[in-house]
Amino acid sequence: MDDDDVEVGPGRAIPTDYIPVNLVPAKNGEIIKLGLITCRVLEDGSRTDNRIGAAEFTLPPGLSGPPAHWHEMHDECFLTTQGVIRYHLPKADGTEDIIDAKEGDFVTVPVRAPHTFSNPTDQEVKFVNTFTPAHYINYFKLLGTYVKEGKPISPKEHLDAMSNYATLPVLRKKAEKK
C-alpha cells in the first residue's frame, strides 16, 4: 500500500508535513563546563517549540550539587546512567528525605518540589536531566559564563543564575534553641 491509498478521516491517517527527527550522537552536543561539572546539551528546545529540553551531566566523586531549590514553572526528570546520585529533599520541618538513585533509576521532580543532589561516592556519576519547558537549559548556559572550569560553583553563583529562571532557594528551618 502506498500513501495515495490511505483513507483520510476520523480514525484514519492524517496528512502531515515532513518534520525532521534529531539525533545527537554519543560524545556530541554542546558542552558547557560548570566548574567541576560537565553538561552536554542533548535538546535545547529549538526543535520542540521549547516544550522539552534535555542534557547529560557528569559529576566527579564527592561533589555537592546546587543549593536546595524549587522551580516555579518547570518539571524535571532524572535518569541515572552511571553510578549513584543522591537526591536531598528538604521538608518544612527542617528534615529531609534522601533518595539514592542507582544506574537505571528514574526520578521525577514536579513543580515546587524542593530538591538538590550530590555525588556522595568515590565514583563519577552521569545522569540525563529533562526539563519542561526547555527554557531552563539557558540557566546552565548562563551559569557556565559565571564559573571557571576546574573550580567549584559557589552557592551565590548558583542562586544568581537560578533567580533568572523561576527557581527559588529553599528556606531552611533553623533548629530551635533550648
Question: Which positions does each model-derived feature cover?
Answer:
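Long, hydrophobic/aromatic N-terminal blocks
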Residues: D2-G45
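Short acidic-glycine-tyrosine-enriched beta hairpin
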Residues: P25, K91-R112
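A short glycine-rich, His/Asp/Glu-containing loop-to-beta-strand
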Residues: N28-A68, H74
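Hydrophobic small-molecule pocket/channel-lining residues, especially in calycin-type beta-barrels
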Residues: G45, L63-S64, H71, I85-R86, ...
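Short, conserved beta-strand element in jelly-roll/cupin
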Residues: E56-P61, W70-K91, T130
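Tight coil/turn sites that cap or link beta-strands
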Residues: P60-L63, G104, R112, D122
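Short beta-strand His + acidic residue motifs that chelate non-heme Fe in jelly-roll/DSBH
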Residues: P67-A68, Y87-L89, V109, H115-T121, ...
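Double-stranded beta-helix
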Residues: T116-K178
